[in-house]
Each structure stands twice: as C-alpha cells, then as structure tokens.
Amino acid sequence: MRVFNFSAGPAAMPEEVLRQAADEMLDWHGSGMSVMEMSHRGKEFMSIHEAALTDLRDLLGVPASHRILFLQGGGIAENAIVPMNLLGARKTADFVVTGSWSQKSFGEAKKFCAPHLAASGKTEAGFTRAPARAEWQLSDDPAYVHLCTNETIDGVETFEIPDLGDVPLVADVSSHILSRPMDVAKYGVLFGGAQKNIGMAGVTVVIVREDLLDRALSICPSAFEWKTIAANNSLYNTPPTYAIYIAGLVFQWLKRQGGLEAIEARNIEKSKLLYDTIDASSFYLNKVEPAARSRMNVPFFLADETRNEDFLAGAKARGLLQLKGHKSVGGMRASIYNAVPLEGVKALVEYMKDFEQRGA
C-alpha cells in the first residue's frame, strides 16, 4: 500500500516516475541495459543527460546567459563550493539569514572569507520572517549576496527577489525549485540538492551566470570548479547517472502536468488548505509570519506537546508518514512538495481535526 509521505527529503516522488523507472530498470529503451550500467560517455546515457538539461532549461526558462551544471555533494557542499568559485580577489560575501540553512551557509563561508551578516529573520520565536530588501545592510564590495529562498527546517520562504545590480545574488533553492516560476535572470547562481522536488538524492543542480565562471580561488578542487565542469558538460568525472536519469523523468512529468504555472497553482491550493486548518485551530500553531510562510515545508506545533508521540502514532496508522519536525525545532512538519497530491493534504487535515476533537 502506498502511503502519503511528508518527508522533508529524500521526499515523495511522483508515482508515474517510479513506475516508469521500474519498467525501464532492466532494459532502457531496448538497449538491453539498466541506466545504472551505462557508460556515462555512451550514446544511450548522453541522450538522457542532454534531455534532462534541455527540459530543465525549458521548465525554468533559463536564459542563454546561464549554464546548467550537474554536480555532487548536495547543498551542504555548495556552501563551500560557492565561495571557492565566486570570491575571486574579494574578501567578503554578504548573507541574508532567514533560517537554519542560510545560517549554516554563513558559518561555512568563514573558512574562506569574512562573511557579513546583511540581515536576519530571527525573532524571539525563532526564524519567523523574511527581511525585506530595505532591511538589507550590504557591505561595500561583496563578492556576492547569499540567500536561502526556502528554509526547509523553519518553513520560511522568500518571494520578493530584489535586483542587486552588479552584485551577484546566490540562492539556495534546494527545497522549492520547480515549485513555481522563477526569474532566473535575477540570479548569479542558483543551487539545489535533488532530493526534494528534482528527484532522488545524489545529484546537485547548479545554474550559474556564464560571466561568473572565471572567479574561482586557486584552492578550488578541479572537480568542484564550475568553469571546469561547464567546459566538460558536467562530465568531467563520472556523474551520478541514475540520479540524473530520475531527475529527467521528473522534468518530463512536470511538463505533462502543465509546467510550473500549473504546479504553482496546485501548491498554493495545498498549502492554503493546511495553513487555514492550522490558523482556524487553537490546538495547532505555526509561528511564521503569513507573508513568509513556505508552500513546501509547513512546521506546526501542538498546544499540548506531551501529545506529540500520540499524534505521530495516529498519523502513521492512517498512512501519514514522516511528520516529525526537525530535531532542532521540534513539533511537526509537513513537507508538501510537488509530488505530494492534494488528497494527501486533505487526509492530513482530516486527521488533524479528528485528533484535536478527541483531545478537546
């Protein structure tokens, strides 16, 4: 029996994609091989690779000024890879810290430069807001400005993206990429791990403006130097072939759904249903300011936290899994990525109401 999976990542996958991958597991398109067995330089995998790059460019509307790279290491590795590729001769980078992940990025940058905290969304209740551009106090000559546009742990999403002129904007988009249209031209760099909306863990997507490819520090390993990766079409070393294949299937699935405009409408409907249920209740609480609430990751807390384990056990009995909040903040978290159907959110909302009534 398939369950409704609310995991923050690795996360729910479109069932169509899983079934197609299962059908093609032993024999991809008459090749007699599994994708797992293919040479990454053979014509079979090259067709998969190129299709994935093309479909992602189409979905996001990536302009010709930007290159799409497939790397490894996840968003965590990019926290080091970004400064090694962008600092050049500059000594600082600016950070807008809106949650746990951008805070981690800020800390990692200290190994390479003197990062500057341009703004913070932290309040007495934790990370609950996304500072507006007017609040950003940028340094005089930063190499770039870093922003995590969706904080997976804290449930904070930044929707208003400013134009910073000549200063490159770097965004960690791991947990909301492909959930809505984006103006990629506004960014110098976008990066994201695949295990939320792109596909399975193992591949990291980096989208970088081509004129930024000449800034790498001399200490940057060749395998992580974007210029080298771009020059070799993301095939400098053996790529995570199966993860790229799965990502390509997800891109095709997204196109069949009507693209990102259609997906965004679904995500708005799903998140509104869940937030409305929380707000109408005196038993559940979400601490994030409404304007900054994530459509992908919805943390919530029970008024009586001694009942947390009962809540999780009851949810599991109904086939609602992976609802436990991150250990750093506690409570609950429902991650409702693209592949989580509206029916799953409706089932969760029904359970939440039933649980509240039983405890009243």
From Swiss-Prot:
Pathway(s) of this molecule: Amino-acid biosynthesis; L-serine biosynthesis; L-serine from 3-phospho-D-glycerate: step 2/3; Cofactor biosynthesis; pyridoxine 5'-phosphate biosynthesis; pyridoxine 5'-phosphate from D-erythrose 4-phosphate: step 3/5
BP-aspect Gene Ontology terms: L-serine biosynthetic process; pyridoxine biosynthetic process
Record keywords: Amino-acid biosynthesis, Aminotransferase, Cytoplasm, Pyridoxal phosphate, Pyridoxine biosynthesis, Serine biosynthesis, Transferase
Amino-acid biosynthesis in keyword set: yes
Compartments, record wording: Cytoplasm
Main location: cytoplasm
Protein known as: Phosphoserine aminotransferase
Organism phylogeny: Bacteria, Pseudomonadati, Pseudomonadota, Betaproteobacteria, Burkholderiales
The gene coding this protein: serC
